[in-house]
Amino acid sequence: MPLVSISLRKGKSETYRQALIDGVYQAMRDTFSVPEDDQFITVTEHDPSNFRYGASYLDIARSDDVVFIQISAMASQTSDQKKALYARIVELLANNPGMRPEDVFVNVIEGVKENWSLGNGIAQYA
């Protein structure tokens, strides 16, 4: 049950933002075996003055189209699954909405099952 936050600079269309959501969700389904309808994703747009990135950190040439994707998930994925997720996200977002691979920044944060309550004030997975 991943919880996803996508951050980008203001100015992209609703269609573009929806393509980000759809691509990340499909990549998680393909690599993390996320079930259908397990969609908990937000998109936050930022004014340029509130959005900073390293334009060439680690010799990766990022543009103003860079997107930060942070995925909080239970600690159950292998290193290979995470690598596959990163590659699949880049592949899908390159296809639609046409992102450059250099502009896809992904961070996975893992936690234990008892750290999750999906509603009703209970820990469904603990």
Language model region names:
Residues 1-126:
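Interaction-mediating elements
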